[in-house]
Amino acid sequence: MADLARVLLLATLAAAAPQALAQSFAGNEIVAGTAAELSTAIATRHAELENDLEAIAMLVDTLILPRFDMRRGSRAILAEHWDSASPTDRDRFVTAFYEYLVATYGDLLLYFKPDTLRVLPFDGDAANSPARVHTIITLNDGTEVDVDFVMIGGGGEWRVVDIEAEGVSYVRTYRSQFRVDIAVDGLGSVIEWLEQKAASVPASATR
């Protein structure tokens, strides 16, 4: 789970400008430009970000979160449990899950380099939703990982709802994990666990 999460979270950086990418579906230069901008921000603030998870979270909030439909993704993860959950529990899960991901894996942002991702030509129908943006992420050891961004939208509004690394879906992976946990302990306990995990990471930490 940890290795998958690391690949997926690094992959989210390729979607820092998905709305522009989604409209053209051939905007390699847009992704490259955005990646370079992000890389510059990290380079100029590296010391600050390295010691302050809250600053990392704010950077993620600004550059990445707006490009993802966390609510729709959370609904897909909870599946049938979303339908039976109260509105309050739905909201709590969306928030807790996002904060858990940032708290647990947010410091991977520090290792992002623009030359580690390559966006492939779009081979689908831009008029149909969902659409897939195919990319290749190069890991530190040189391994190339095929990563697809599954996007839903239309017109000028496209947002990421799932990421698949080598065919392994972020949504399906967490759905399988949480489905077992919910069956044993209930949704409320899962939400509390996510909240506790997110809160257990200090706002200022080097990991």
At which residue positions do the language-model features occur?
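Short beta-strand edge/turn micro-motifs at domain boundaries
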Residues: 144-172
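Bacterial N-terminal signal peptides that target proteins for export
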Residues: 1-8
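Surface-exposed, polar/charged faces of alpha-helical domains
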Residues: 25, 40, 44-47, 51-55, ...
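Low-complexity, intrinsically disordered terminal/linker segments enriched in charged
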Residues: 162-207
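Short, linear, compositionally biased motifs with a strong N-terminal bias
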Residues: 11-14
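Early exported N-terminus immediately downstream of N-terminal targeting peptides
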Residues: 24-105
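Surface-exposed, charged secondary-structure patches
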Residues: 103-145, 197-207
